[in-house]
């Protein structure tokens, strides 16, 4: 296992996670580097999406779940009693598997979160909406139709809108749970290009079943199996010279 604590922004320390009596994650210790893309791979049910969701306390919304160990964000345990989960989720944003725009206008999809956090001045909101859509490489496609319902956008545009919506909250980290699995190849390529651009300013952690995608977009890769972190290393090493036989068997298609 490789740890890179000199530049880590998130660190998990001996994390165990339970759904009721079922243990979904066992003794997970990882460092996530700042301004890098980290991919989490493994077969269905291996715990990678569970780990992603506990990195910003999304699992708090599930009855009966329990976390042991520490999840440190900038050296603060996000599960400490004094930590505000709403603020945690603002700074560690999430993009889901299927595009989930609000049934509102394109403009209001981006402005909704900032309004809840105190943005009131129209000119400030307009500037924030434009900059967020620019970062998500969507501005040129929607700048003339901002009053239109977000539901009229294509699937790929909706997913970029959801990324822009997350960016409008000024996060430090962006979590992506299979963000292209519901998209066509052209839309997938656009999202991958966007991920490459966003890593200049954000830390990105992506769950993907697509091994080729993990190889293309990430600098680090963690392989999970049955709730355990089997191997964590530079992506190139994981895919060309893995240290664990289970990793090699998975990436060569022997199981999964």
From Swiss-Prot:
**What Pfam families does the database record attribute to this sequence?**
ABC_tran
Species of origin: Syntrophus aciditrophicus (strain SB)
What broad class describes the main subcellular location of this protein? membrane
Q: Which residues form the ABC transporter domain?
A: 10-251
Give GO cellular component annotations, separated by semicolons: plasma membrane
Where is this chain's protein located in or outside the cell? Answer: Cell inner membrane
- A GO MF term: ATP hydrolysis activity
Its job: Part of the ABC transporter complex PstSACB involved in phosphate import. Responsible for energy coupling to the transport system.
Membrane topology summary? Peripheral membrane protein
Q: What does the organism's lineage look like at the top?
A: Bacteria, Pseudomonadati, Thermodesulfobacteriota, Syntrophia, Syntrophales
Q: Which UniProt keywords apply?
A: ATP-binding, Cell inner membrane, Cell membrane, Membrane, Nucleotide-binding, Phosphate transport, Translocase, Transport
Residues annotated to bind ATP? 42-49
Question: GO:BP terms for this protein?
Answer: phosphate ion transmembrane transport
Instruction: Return the EC number.
Output: 7.3.2.1
Q: What is this protein called?
A: Phosphate import ATP-binding protein PstB
Q: Which residues form a coiled coil?
A: none
Query: What's the subunit arrangement here?
Result: The complex is composed of two ATP-binding proteins (PstB), two transmembrane proteins (PstC and PstA) and a solute-binding protein (PstS).
| PROSITE patterns recorded | ABC_TRANSPORTER_1, ABC_TRANSPORTER_2, PSTB
Provide the reaction this enzyme catalyses.
phosphate(out) + ATP + H2O = ADP + 2 phosphate(in) + H(+)
> If you read the UniProt record, what top EC class would you report for this enzyme, in one word?
translocase
Top-rank lineage group of the source organism: Bacteria
């Amino acid at each position: 296992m490789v740890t890179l604590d000199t530049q880590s922004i998130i660190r998990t320390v001996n994390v165990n996670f339970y759904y009721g009596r079922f243990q979904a994650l066992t003794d997970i210790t990882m460092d996530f580097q700042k301004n890098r893309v980290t991919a989490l791979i493994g077969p269905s049910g291996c715990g990678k999406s569970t780990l992603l969701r506990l990195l910003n306390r999304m699992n708090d919304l599930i009855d009966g779940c329990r976390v042991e160990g520490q999840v440190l964000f900038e050296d603060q345990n996000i599960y400490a009693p004094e930590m505000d989960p709403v603020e945690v989720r603002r700074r560690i944003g999430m993009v889901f598997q299927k595009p989930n725009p609000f049934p509102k206008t394109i403009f209001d999809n981006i402005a909704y979160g900032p309004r809840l956090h105190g943005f009131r001045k129209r000119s400030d909101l307009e500037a924030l909406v434009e900059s967020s859509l620019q970062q998500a490489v969507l501005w040129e496609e929607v700048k003339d139709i901002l009053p239109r319902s977000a539901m009229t956008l294509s699937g790929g545009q909706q997913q970029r809108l959801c990324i822009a919506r997350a960016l409008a909250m000024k996060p430090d980290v962006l979590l992506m749970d299979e963000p292209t699995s519901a998209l066509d190849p052209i839309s997938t390529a656009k999202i991958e290009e966007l991920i490459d651009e966003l890593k200049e300013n954000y830390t990105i952690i992506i769950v993907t079943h697509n091994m080729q995608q993990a190889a293309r977009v990430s600098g680090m890769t963690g392989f999970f199996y049955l709730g355990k972190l089997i191997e964590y290393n530079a992506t190139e090493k994981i895919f060309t010279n893995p240290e664990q036989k289970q990793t090699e068997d998975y990436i060569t298609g022997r199981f999964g």
